[in-house]
C-alpha cells in the first residue's frame, strides 16, 4: 500500500479516536448501550441483516432495556414480554406518545390518527374508534362485508382452475375492500385500474419502508434527505395515494347529506362543519387526509401480508392444513359460509391463525413510542420526548412463553385438552394505549378469509414442503414474505 494512503488512514483513525474521547457523555441516566460515535451514532453496530438483528445482538450484551443512538438521537429499546408490558401497560400514559419514522415523516408530520400526539391523538382516536364501530354495526356489519368479499375471492380463485398464481394482488384486494367500505363507503372491482394502481403503490411502498436503505436513513435523515434514495420514492408514492384520496374527499363533500352520513369521510366532514368556529379544533383537512391514508394503508397491507405468510406456511406444513380443513368440515361443512360464531368451536383453526401471526412477526420492531414526560423506568430516567421502541419480535419469540419460539407450531396456543390458550406474549398488534386501531377488524378478516379459502380449496405448490423457503424478502419496519406461487384447487 502507498505510504501516502497509510498516512491518510492513520490520520483518519486518529481523528476519529479524538472525536470519540472528546465526545461528551450526553446520555445522562439513560439505560446502557454501545458508545456512539459523533454524528454516526451506533451505525457501526448496524448489522447488514437490518435493525432487528442488530438490536437482538445488543440485547445479549446489555439486557432487556438499552439505548441505541440512531445518528445523534438516543432511542431506548424494550425487549421481552414482561418489559414491554411493564412500560406500555403498567405505565401506559407515560409511554403513550408516538415517535417518528424519518422516512415517512415528510408526509405524516405528526398528523392523522396513527402518528399524532397529545390532545390531537386522543381526539382523533376517540372519533375513529366510534366511527368505525358505528359503520361496522349498521345496516351491514363488518362480518357481512367480510363474508361477501370472501365469496368474491372464491369466485376469482375458481377462475384460476388450479393453475399456480402469486396471491399478493388478490389478498390485497380483499383487505383493501373491507377498509374501503368502512372509510370510503364503497368497494372496488378487482379489475378497476385506479384500484390496481393504488395496490401497486401500497405494495412497493411497504417493501421500500422495510428495505435496508430505509433503515440506514433512520440514522442520517437530516443529511440523506438532500440526496436521491428510497425515501424520495416513498414520499412520491404516498403523495400519489393522497392525491387520489383528495378526489374521493371532494366527491363526498359535493354529495354530502347531513341527515345520512355514508361512511367515515362523511362523518368527519360533518364534525369539521360543526367545529369550524373552533380555531383550536383537530378536525381539519390535514388530519382527515393523513388519517385516511393511515387507515387505508395499514388496513390493506398488514392484513394481506399476514394472509400471504399464512398460506406460505400452509404449503410448508400440509399436515396443519389438513387438520384445519378437517375442523372446518366438522364445524361448518360445505353448504354455508363461515361465520364469526364458528370461531369458539374451532380451537385448532384459531390456534393456527394465532401462530401465523406470531411466526410472521409482521412488525418486528413495532412503531416507535415517545415518553410524554420525564419518566422513571427500571431505575433509569427517560427525559420527556425520548423515543422508545417496543421490540415486538422479542415478545412473539419469547422462550419464557413459547417452548420453541423459532418453530411454527400451533400447539403454542393450545392447552392439554385442545382448547385455545391465550398468551401474554401475543402482541402482533402491539399493546397498551397505542394498540392497533383496527385490531378487531383484522382478527375477523383473518378468521373469515382463512376459513373460507380452505373450506373451498385445497392448496399446493410445485415445490416440496422441505424446499419452501420462509426467509423474509425484507425485514425492517415490517417483515415482507418471499414471493411464491400457489395452486388453489376446488375441493
From Swiss-Prot:
CDD domains: CYP2B. The keyword Lipid metabolism does not apply. Its EC number is 1.14.14.1. One of its GO terms (molecular function) is steroid hydroxylase activity. It is a peripheral membrane protein. Keywords: Endoplasmic reticulum, Heme, Iron, Membrane, Metal-binding, Microsome, Monooxygenase, Oxidoreductase, Phosphoprotein. GO terms for biological process: epoxygenase P450 pathway; nicotine metabolic process; response to calcium ion; response to metal ion; xenobiotic metabolic process. Heme binds at residue 436. It is found in: Endoplasmic reticulum membrane; Microsome membrane. The modification Phosphoserine is found at residue 128. GO terms for cellular component: cytoplasm; endoplasmic reticulum membrane; intracellular membrane-bounded organelle. Phosphorylation is accompanied by a decrease in enzyme activity. It holds the Pfam family p450. Induction: By phenobarbital. Cytochromes P450 are a group of heme-thiolate monooxygenases. In liver microsomes, this enzyme is involved in an NADPH-dependent electron transport pathway. It oxidizes a variety of structurally unrelated compounds, including steroids, fatty acids, and xenobiotics. Belongs to the cytochrome P450 family. This is Cytochrome P450 2B2.
